[in-house]
UniProtKB/Swiss-Prot annotation:
Annotated compartments: Cytoplasm, Cytoskeleton; Cell projection; Nucleus
Protein's UniProt name: Actin-related protein 2/3 complex subunit 4
Chief subcellular location: cytoplasm
Similarity annotation: Belongs to the ARPC4 family.
Length: 168
């Protein structure tokens, strides 16, 4: 793991642990409704200040909290065109299977690659520290996966180019 990744992930972990102090909060507008306030944005007093944790200009995390929900949006490192394409395809693959990941949003926040929505119901049903561990582990693994896919694509392209050039 690189020297800058560990402090970045530690900052995200600490911020998520602080933001996951959620409680049940019924809607102030409709009786017997309970919607994530971070999504609905019905009243300003229920929203916390959004926090952006940035490793560099392209790799950052936006944590938006409210009284009953937290939205975590992640921008993954995309150094070149191959990484952009791989990241887009991988995120699309993940979001198509959002129903299998209870906290994954189908559509990311504008300017980010993937978003998670954690509500008070998730923190009641699952351990908070396990939710935080999942997000951190996801951030570690996504970087590794995209790097491995890039190496695989480059190796495959090299083999194809060699085979093509054998004919000349």
């Amino acid at each position: 793991m690189t020297a800058t990744l560990r402090p970045y992930l530690n900052a995200v972990r600490a911020t998520l642990q602080a933001a996951l102090c959620l409680e049940n909060f019924s809607s102030q507008v409709v009786e017997r409704h309970n919607k994530p306030e971070v999504e609905v944005r019905s009243s300003k007093e229920l929203l916390l200040q959004p926090v952006v944790i940035s490793r560099n200009e392209k790799e950052k995390v936006l944590i938006e909290g409210s009284i009953n929900s937290v939205r975590v949006s992640i921008a993954v490192k995309q150094a070149d065109e191959i990484e952009k394409i791989l990241c887009h395809k991988f995120m699309r693959f993940m979001m198509m299977r959002a129903e299998n990941f209870f906290i994954l949003r189908r559509k990311p926040v504008e300017g980010y690659d993937i978003s998670f929505l954690i509500t008070n119901f998730h923190t009641e049903q699952m351990y908070k520290h396990k939710l935080v561990d999942f997000v951190i582990h996801f951030m570690e693994e996504i970087d590794k996966e995209i790097s491995e896919m890039k190496l695989s694509v480059n190796a495959r392209a090299r083999i194809v180019a060699e085979e093509f050039l054998k004919n000349f």
